[in-house]
């Protein structure tokens, strides 16, 4: 019989590698396997239960945009179309829109008319002279739109819509000095008609505004003389070949002088609507206001 050492030279005990260790490992593996099975059973129910729970979950339903968010999202053109469509479908809302709309300022109107002139220029055919009829025909619709807007804005600054004569004069001066001078001078007969009609009407409006203002109170002429109106009219007449000389003559009157009556010769002229254009067969008729 050979004698066995009581311990290994590396310091391990015999009990560590004895046969019972093998059985313990197998038992432990069985326990772990059983534990995993229970865990899967507990946290992963079968398909039927899972489907049942899904049916009980509340669904997230889509909704329309809130009106405030919708309006904020629309661009200028889309919002404009929306309002026009609403007015066409519901004419009864027009008065509510007028009451809720902010006051339109003179500067905003001048800026809008300037934008329309710039739009006309941008749409002119490349390297084609404005003397050519083809050039005007290319932008004819935009020119009509411009004159229609001018008519609308001018009426907005006349009595009985607007009684503040300073705003009326501000619009007239702004249009004559900042807008109309930028308009291309087309040689087409229709444009010449519109252009001449514009000057005729603006001269009539200007004379009547000043005459009415002075007749309300004779000392008002002193207010006009103390303003820069005389200088503005001097500049306007320079650009338009003294077309508004009659307005300047009113300012040169002394306090208490007889003021000529309102001009009536153009009171039956149309506004600048292309539908009423006599060149297109329209019938001349009276227009609202003093325009």
From Swiss-Prot:
It comes from the Eukaryota. GO terms for cellular component: cytoplasm; nuclear membrane. This is Tethering factor for nuclear proteasome STS1. InterPro entries: Cut8/Sts1_fam, Cut8/Sts1_sf. One of its GO terms (molecular function) is proteasome binding. It is found in: Cytoplasm; Nucleus. Keywords: Cytoplasm, Nucleus, Protein transport, Transport. Binds the proteasome. Residues 37-56 are annotated as: Disordered. The keyword Transport applies. It comes from Komagataella phaffii (strain GS115 / ATCC 20864) (Yeast). The gene is STS1. GO terms for biological process: nuclear protein quality control by the ubiquitin-proteasome system; proteasome localization; protein transport. The keyword Cytoplasm applies. Belongs to the cut8/STS1 family. Involved in ubiquitin-mediated protein degradation. Regulatory factor in the ubiquitin/proteasome pathway that controls the turnover of proteasome substrates. Targets proteasomes to the nucleus and facilitates the degradation of nuclear proteins. Its main location: cytoplasm.
